[in-house]
């Protein structure tokens, strides 16, 4: 049984990943929680997100900004850090990130969205 601080919901949302060099990638969101989001990407995009082309664990800090339009009233814009990385196939990778520095109002809106399963 998975024990989590916050529920995780499956989503079908675009996640805009904004890198420090100005590149923006729109990737399909897989799931969302109070704490973070996960998405999949191909090998080429992975090479852009990870400076060394791979992620070796939490000590390997990889941060970027996210923008996720959750609905017409709420777009989540925040900094994030990679917390999970999984190779799914030769050209597909799963990346999990944790949100950083959410203010109280944004955190409240996110909790409301997740608890309402995005409705």
Residue ranges: model-predicted function:
Residues 1-119:
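Structured alpha-helical
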